[in-house]
């Protein structure tokens, strides 16, 4: 089996690092393809060294362009590389333009796509990432869903449950892996104050003067904390444009930094009192490291963190930002609940599950793209109440059907093969020639 891994940004590299470790451990042949969406070549090489990863076999170097130009350049470069490499599967991770391009090119070449972090949905189509997620998943052959909620999103969109593997999220594996490296390599000096780590880069916040002003004025009032703010270049540009940067620079409790290296940032995050962010990945990292998270957005494709109690959506609401942070500070029971929120993303073995599932597909001859054999058959989709003691697997085998979704009362459930269906309703597909 040969795996081609397509990555383009720092978060993708971070989340795929434990998957690469697992592939290497099993001596599986693989090719690492870096599209170069975020970094110049030299910076990228240093990042791979810091995380103790092998250098990419291919570097496309698309750089920063419009979404259309970046996707087109990536697709053009990938097509030639995949013709040369001839992988059995192309793995992509997340929701970037590299994911979109990788999924489109591979599926057009009839190479199976494995999407790590499949099924995430914000249901906000103004976000380019949401478009990338949806389109990539329509091209995907193996869906590595991080949670059951993500798996259900895929089922509702018509994905076959046989191709959905609930793995947990590799961010847990990555945090555990990379924090060990950070403690060895990071040279950042951390103060003993109550640190609030702040990151902000999304267009809906930094391009909107009203929202940005509201967030900044909240920060200025939170002088009982030490707020450490590694400022993204685009964010700084807009802060200066809207005459807000000098206000932050004058505040003694706010420390403005240049963007930190990943290992330094991870160590900072792990020692924080709380985190304020509009990043999707940071919501996952915070709950993994038991750090209370306040998300500067009104929606999230990581709703599991909110439901678990480790994340609160505060948007750009000045009062809500201030009140929530003060509640965390003053109500120790509330703070403990956030710190001890159960991690919805698993036990740190997502990478192992991903490679196990991929090898199982390969061993069974299921890593193939071919037309369905029953394309001319009559599909009947039925809702049934199951009154007998029987599992999903046994029902499918006996009635030659495919259970799509299980309803336990009013709540949908993923149809795990060993699930007992007695007293539950199922939606199942039956093919009749």
Question: Where are the regions that the model predicts?
Answer:
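A nucleotide-sugar donor-handling region in carbohydrate enzymes
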Residues: 38-42, 139-211, 314
């Amino acid at each position: 089996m040969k795996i081609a891994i397509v990555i383009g940004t720092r978060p993708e590299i971070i989340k795929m690092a434990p998957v690469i470790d697992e592939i290497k451990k099993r001596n599986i042949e693989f090719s690492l393809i870096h599209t170069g969406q975020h970094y110049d070549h030299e910076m990228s090489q240093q990042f791979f060294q810091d995380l103790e990863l092998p250098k990419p076999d291919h570097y496309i170097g698309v750089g920063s362009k419009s979404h259309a130009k970046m996707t087109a350049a990536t697709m053009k470069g990938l097509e030639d590389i995949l013709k040369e490499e001839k992988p059995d599967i192309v793995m992509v991770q997340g929701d970037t333009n590299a994911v979109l391009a990788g999924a489109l090119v591979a599926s057009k070449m009839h190479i199976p796509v494995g999407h790590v972090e499949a099924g995430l949905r914000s249901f906000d189509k103004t976000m380019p990432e949401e478009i990338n997620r949806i389109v990539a998943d329509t091209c995907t052959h193996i869906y590595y869903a991080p949670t059951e909620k993500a798996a259900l999103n895929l089922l509702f969109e018509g994905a076959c449950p046989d191709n959905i593997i609930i793995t947990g999220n590799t961010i847990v594996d990555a945090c555990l892996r990379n924090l060990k490296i950070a403690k060895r390599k990071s040279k950042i000096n951390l103060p003993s104050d109550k640190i609030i780590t702040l990151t902000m880069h999304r267009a809906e916040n930094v391009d909107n003067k009203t929202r940005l002003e509201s967030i900044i004025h909240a920060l200025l009032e939170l002088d009982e904390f030490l707020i450490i703010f590694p400022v993204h270049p685009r964010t700084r540009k807009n802060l200066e444009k809207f005459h807000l940067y000098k206000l932050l620079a004058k505040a003694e409790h706010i420390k403005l930094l240049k963007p930190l290296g990943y290992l330094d940032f991870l160590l900072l995050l792990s020692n924080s009192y709380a985190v304020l962010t509009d990043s999707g990945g940071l919501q996952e990292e915070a709950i993994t490291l038991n750090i209370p998270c306040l998300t500067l957005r009104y929606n999230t494709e990581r709703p599991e963190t909110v439901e678990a109690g480790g994340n609160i959506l505060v948007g750009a609401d000045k009062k809500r930002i201030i009140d929530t942070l003060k509640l965390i500070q003053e109500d120790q029971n509330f703070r403990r609940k956030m710190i001890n929120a159960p991690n919805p993303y698993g036990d740190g073995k997502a990478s192992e599950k991903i490679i196990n599932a991929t090898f199982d597909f390969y061993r069974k001859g299921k890593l193939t793209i071919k037309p369905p054999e029953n394309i001319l058959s009559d599909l009947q989709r039925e809702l049934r109440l199951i009154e007998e003691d029987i599992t999903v697997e046994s029902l499918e085998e006996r009635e030659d059907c495919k259970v799509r979704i299980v309803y336990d009362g009013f709540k949908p459930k993923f149809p795990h093969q060993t699930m007992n269906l007695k007293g539950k309703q199922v939606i199942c597909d039956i093919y009749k020639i």
